[in-house]
Amino acid sequence: MAVAQQLRAESDFEQLPDDVAISANIADIEEKRGFTSHFVFVIEVKTKGGSKYLIYRRYRQFHALQSKLEERFGPDSKSSALACTLPTLPAKVYVGVKQEIAEMRIPALNAYMKSLLSLPVWVLMDEDVRIFFYQSPYDSEQVPQALRRLRPRTRKVKSVSPQGNSVDRMAAPRAEALFDFTGNSKLELNFKAGDVIFLLSRINKDWLEGTVRGATGIFPLSFVKILKDFPEEDDPTNWLRCYYYEDTISTIKDIAVEEDLSSTPLLKDLLELTRREFQREDIALNYRDAEGDLVRLLSDEDVALMVRQARGLPSQKRLFPWKLHITQKDNYRVYNTMP
């Protein structure tokens, strides 16, 4: 019997919480324009309790997790009783096209996650492992673009009675078929031109889920005309507020950032983002401390301190709690030098 099967046959595994991840598979990659342009892996996670959900992770997050696990469970860890053979993470690649690199990593990262989730239960219960596979509020707000490696999910629903309340039916999201559509699998909905399809969900930008004549399935948006769309959803875009100071004027600009509000960026990524947005290279990044004085950001540690100090402060919805104050690199008059 394989090690993973032995572990799952033991009572320790049965006593794990239902929300512990037991399998994970990469469904797609997507480009994100966060503090810097990058690709994320869209990962379908399955839990012991049978739940499924999607999470979005960068390679650097895999690397950070592996580093922590090596400290705790590697051959040189202080807790030798908990040491185990950790899976190998594919190495960093420093040169190449980002999308091609991400695509090439998928098989190795899938194998990495499979091996990781087959380790002893104390690894599965490790705080950083659980956080890595946990669906954060940011993850849950994302709308997957394609999920090329998974079929779009569907669900069973009760059929809508033709004798049902006609007012309720007319208020429901619905679409009219423009063309005949015959699905390639039982997951896909068949309909004829002119059919009115009641909409259940938006799978992604190209596919919808709906029901017609008691059947439920997915279908391409291009085959229908929307008669009544879904209610408008809250825009999931987060914004970084920047105060830009020139010699005689200052301006405020909010930059759209596809990152979790709780994330901590790297200084080089913030510099790249602001230089691109303000079309200036000779700038310095700052934040205001508790006394209201400007403090220049010189390292990743400074950025982490800025983020920590902003936690708990009141902030607007979709706006990072910390703000950037952008000054000219050689202008030191903006700093308070009084003791």
Curated annotation (Swiss-Prot):
Transmembrane segments: none
Pfam families on file: PB1, PX, SH3_1
Mutation effect (residue 251 to A): No effect on phosphorylation
Protein residues bound to a 1,2-diacyl-sn-glycero-3-phospho-(1D-myo-inositol-3-phosphate): 58-60, 92-94
Tissue occurrence: Expression is restricted to hematopoietic cells.
Modified-residue entries (Phosphoserine), positions: 315
GO molecular-function terms, A-Z: phosphatidylinositol-3-phosphate binding; superoxide-generating NADPH oxidase activator activity
Outcome, altering residue 274 to A: No effect on phosphorylation
Domain SH3: 170-229
Every PX domain range: 19-140
GO biological process: phagocytosis; respiratory burst; superoxide anion generation
GO CC terms in record: cytoplasm; cytosol; endosome membrane; membrane; NADPH oxidase complex; phagolysosome; plasma membrane
Residue numbers bearing the Phosphothreonine modification: 154
Cell compartments where the protein resides: Cytoplasm, Cytosol; Endosome membrane; Membrane
Residue span, PB1 domain: 237-329
Presence of keyword Phosphoprotein: yes
Impact after mutating residue 58 to Q: Abolishes interaction with membranes enriched in phosphatidylinositol 3-phosphate
Effect of residue 105 to Q: In CGD3; the protein remains cytosolic, does not localize to phagosomes or endosomes and is unable to bind phosphatidylinositol 3-phosphate (PtdIns(3)P) in a lipid-binding assay; unable to rescue the NADPH-oxidase defect of NCF4 functionally null cells
Keywords tagged on the record: Chronic granulomatous disease, Cytoplasm, Disease variant, Endosome, Lipid-binding, Membrane, Phosphoprotein, SH3 domain
Disease named in the record: Granulomatous disease, chronic, autosomal recessive, 3: A form of chronic granulomatous disease, a primary immunodeficiency characterized by severe recurrent bacterial and fungal infections, along with manifestations of chronic granulomatous inflammation. It results from an impaired ability of phagocytes to mount a burst of reactive oxygen species in response to pathogens.
PANTHER family according to UniProt: NEUTROPHIL CYTOSOL FACTOR 4 (PTHR15706:SF20), SH3 MULTIPLE DOMAIN (PTHR15706)
Protein task: Subunit of the phagocyte NADPH oxidase complex that mediates the transfer of electrons from cytosolic NADPH to O2 to produce the superoxide anion (O2(-)). In the activated complex, electrons are first transferred from NADPH to flavin adenine dinucleotide (FAD) and subsequently transferred via two heme molecules to molecular oxygen, producing superoxide through an outer-sphere reaction.
Summary of subunit composition and partner proteins: Component of the phagocyte NADPH oxidase complex composed of an obligatory core heterodimer formed by the membrane proteins CYBA and CYBB and the cytosolic regulatory subunits NCF1/p47-phox, NCF2/p67-phox, NCF4/p40-phox and the small GTPase RAC1 or RAC2. Part of a cytosolic complex composed at least by NCF1, NCF2 and NCF4. Interacts with NCF2 and NCF1. The NCF2-NCF4 complex interacts with GBP7 (via GB1/RHD3-type G domain).
This protein's domain notes: The PB1 domain mediates the association with NCF2/p67-PHOX.
Name listed for the protein in its UniProt record: Neutrophil cytosol factor 4
Gene behind the chain: NCF4
